[in-house]
A protein has these predicted regions:
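Short, hydrophobic/aliphatic alpha-helical segments
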Residues: 2-21
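Conserved phosphate/anionic-ligand binding catalytic regions in large, soluble enzymes, centered on
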Residues: 16-37, 143-161
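Amphipathic alpha-helix face/heptad-repeat signature
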Residues: 29-33, 61, 68-75, 114-124, ...
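A conserved active-site cap/scaffold subdomain adjacent to cofactor or substrate pockets
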Residues: 37-44
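Short, surface-exposed loop/turn segments at secondary-structure junctions
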Residues: 48-58, 97, 144, 172-179
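A structural-propensity feature for long, helix-poor, extended segments
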Residues: 49-87, 188, 195
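Amphipathic alpha-helical interface segments
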Residues: 79, 83-152, 156
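Preference for long, well-ordered alpha-helical segments
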Residues: 128-131, 143-202, 209
């Protein structure tokens, strides 16, 4: 599993000429990094003097971020597996008309799944952004910039994942499916960019001397 590799081994694998792990897996990794970093900020808040009123919120935030961390880690491999399935379908026999039809149907179905996996990454990363906003607002002020980096990583996860959704939609014949995912992707992107801007604008204003 990709998630079991060391950081260096993972990066070396990304840098090689194989198409996986690619951008979709990296988007999931961005989500995992956002989850881990926001968990750190929450843990730096719990039990600290002056943050007693935030204790319950931070405990709840940790529950969510740790769950999402595990889910993003699984999605790193899930995205690569989805790509490999599409690639495998293109290798199916296409000698007879029946084989051609079966191959085409298999490619379409595998491509749908290859679009749905990064959409799952984008959805989860958007959910993460709401938690990060709370962690940044109520968490340890000494770690507010860490929360901002987590927010940027989550936004990167969203945008990277949505690019992978859209490139797969381009080859699908099911127009209702395509329209549904395109509409959701556009909404997720707009919301993610707004959430990131709101937090960064507020924190940058506070940090100005």
């Amino acid at each position: 599993m990709l998630a079991d590799l060391t950081v260096k081994d993972f990066l070396d694998k990304v840098a090689c000429s194989d198409p996986v792990p690619g951008g979709g897996s990296i988007a999931a990794l961005d989500g995992a990094l956002a989850s881990a970093l926001s968990t750190m900020v929450a843990r730096l808040t719990v039990g600290k003097k002056g943050y007693e009123a935030s204790e319950e919120v931070m405990q709840h935030a940790q529950t969510i971020t740790l769950r999402l961390l595990d889910e993003f880690i699984a999605l790193i491999d899930k995205d690569s597996a989805a790509y490999n399935e599409v690639f495998a379908c293109f290798k199916l026999p296409k000698t007879t008309d029946e084989e051609k039809a079966a191959r085409s149907a298999a490619i379409q179905e595998a491509t749908k799944q290859a679009a749905l996996v990064p959409l799952e990454v984008a959805r989860k990363a958007l959910d993460m952004m709401s938690v990060i906003a709370d962690v940044a607002r109520l968490g340890n002020r000494n770690a507010v910039t860490d929360a901002c980096v987590a927010m940027m990583a989550a936004r990167s996860a969203v945008l990277g994942a949505l690019l992978n959704v859209r490139i797969n939609l381009g080859s699908l014949k099911d127009r209702d499916f395509v329209l549904q995912l395109q509409t959701e992707a556009d909404t997720i992107e707009q919301t993610a960019c707004r959430r990131e801007k709101e937090l960064l604008d507020a924190v940058n204003q506070d940090l100005r001397i």
